[in-house]
Amino acid sequence: GENLLALDLAQVQRDLELQPWIEHVAVERLLPGTLRIRVSERKPIARIVGFEPSGGKAGFHLTTFFLDREGHAMLPPKNSHVSAPEGARLDRLPYVSGVSGTEIRTGRRVKSLQMDSALQLVEEFARSPMSGLVDLDVVDLSLPGVLVVKTRQKNEITFALDGFDRQMRHWRLIHDLALREGRQVATLDLSVSNNVPARWQEQEPERPSAAVSRPAVDYRRKHV
């Protein structure tokens, strides 16, 4: 094998950190003949659909990417590399939509003030009083200055770009009020500090329940 003393550890670290799923690498030489490498992986918290340049070909193709908390884009891992619990978690991650001109490069950050706020919202939601009560489905960035969150429970919640802790607590208060009155929130605008506009979901007559399955997302690349 290669002489361990001649190995450029900094180059080894740089080469490994070029991999999109790797956040940080620590490389240590342990004489007489051991190389220790510690790897920290990026944790996906959201998904986004965008155009990736076609490798070696002109044009782009439509692809689903994962985003970590800093907005680094990663292609989905192969199914054989993912445990069943982690695969189920990835399938529940919310989508970020409404990003104009979405050209995405693997390993690069998707950067904007709204994107940073959207990823912060997703992170803070997991620690909020609403976690476990509703499931985030989409975080829409198409309106300037706000984030519009759609849940799988058919709620549509508008957030300001900061102060998520206060807004989440306000959401919980209104959620609990709706439960006490036998209602569900349809729309709620938390981006305003006073007189929060809210609308209830229409009450539907009871009908026999039917199992509804959510279609699985196909992460395979689609050419357009």
Where are these regions (language model features)?
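Charged, solvent-exposed interaction patches on well-folded alpha/beta domains
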Residues: G1-N3, A10-L18, H24-V224
